[in-house]
Amino acid sequence: MSATEEILEKLKSLTLLEAADLVKQIEETFGVSAAPAAGVMMAAPGAGGAAGGEEAEEKTEFDVVLEEVPSDKKIAVLKVVRTLTGLGLKEAKEMVESTPKSIKEGVSKEDAEEAKKSLEDAGGKASLK
């Protein structure tokens, strides 16, 4: 097995929290940003002013971000985070305590809205990106 295949296999086994930590370490080590380039979404030639509205309609993958958790609602939100992510208690607790934090990434609009509603019903403040 080549070195790149070994790395890929190790990446597949990372939890969401571990993957987020890895991204931060890569950004710091190599001086790069994981944020997408600003012009990537608007690369269509001849696109007019309506391109922004069309892009928003075409978006099929969403991230659910836990923005804020009131201290009296942490336990309820923690339970929802564990249900949504499948994380263990420790990892979910770290996620809830380090808001804003992406809870689910690259999910359909329906799944993202359902996850957001669950988080808000538990008392947290969530958004879709």
Curated annotation (Swiss-Prot):
A single BP term in Gene Ontology: translation
Compositionally skewed regions (Basic and acidic residues) per UniProt: 95-123
Entry's Gene Ontology cellular component terms: cytosolic large ribosomal subunit
Keywords, comma-separated and alphabetical: Ribonucleoprotein, Ribosomal protein
Domain of life from the UniProt record: Bacteria
GO molecular function, one term: structural constituent of ribosome
Pfam families named among the record's database cross-references: Ribosomal_L12, Ribosomal_L12_N
Residue numbers spanned by region Disordered: 95-129
Function summary: Forms part of the ribosomal stalk which helps the ribosome interact with GTP-bound translation factors. Is thus essential for accurate translation.
NCBIfam families reported in the protein's UniProt record: L12
Assembly and interaction partners: Homodimer. Part of the ribosomal stalk of the 50S ribosomal subunit. Forms a multimeric L10(L12)X complex, where L10 forms an elongated spine to which 2 to 4 L12 dimers bind in a sequential fashion. Binds GTP-bound translation factors.
Family: Belongs to the bacterial ribosomal protein bL12 family.
Protein name, as recorded: Large ribosomal subunit protein bL12
